[in-house]
Design a protein with these regions (language model features):
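Aliphatic-rich helix starts adjacent to a transmembrane/signal segment
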Residues: 2, 6-49
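Flexible, low-complexity segments enriched in proline/glycine/serine and punctuated by aromatic residues
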Residues: 13, 34-43, 47-141
Length: 141
């Protein structure tokens, strides 16, 4: 009976260790959610890019009209089928990836079309390559 309160100290230390472990689990969950969102956005960009490539293949005779002549971040109310397809592509990109920084470029058509999509992926965090993100796809029409 010479030592009293030792059990209380042991319980306090175990609660501290448990608390640190739970904070680590919460941090890992947060990183997984950010990575999942970044992966979702990348998948949506690839699907939208494949859709515009298929639209170009369907309108092969006018594939040269799909060239954007630079970065497109807004729709231009195209008057041709190619212009409407590009406007729909930009609209779908901006709808699936929120933020005003989502832009697309199409160059090199009708031969080797290079489709570039840029967007802000800052939610992914700097440690996962956040901020500006670019996916470049080359396709032969």
């Amino acid at each position: 009976r010479a030592v009293t309160g030792m059990s209380l100290i042991e319980v306090m230390v175990s609660v501290l260790v448990l608390g640190i472990g739970l904070l680590g689990i919460a941090a890992m969950q947060s990183m997984a959610l950010r990575g999942g969102q970044s992966s979702l956005e990348s998948s949506q960009v690839v699907m939208a890019t494949n859709a515009i490539i298929e639209a170009m293949r369907a309108n092969r005779a006018n594939a040269a009209n799909y060239n954007t002549g630079g970065k497109r971040c807004a729709v231009t109310n195209g008057t041709t089928l190619a212009g409407n397809d590009v406007d729909n592509w930009i609209t779908s990109l901006q709808a699936s990836i929120p933020g005003a920084t989502t832009c697309g470029t199409i160059a090199g058509c009708p031969n080797a079309c290079v489709i570039t999509v840029e967007w802000d992926d800052s939610r992914a965090g700097a440690d996962q390559g956040g901020a500006a993100r670019t996916i470049v796809t080359e396709a032969r029409i």
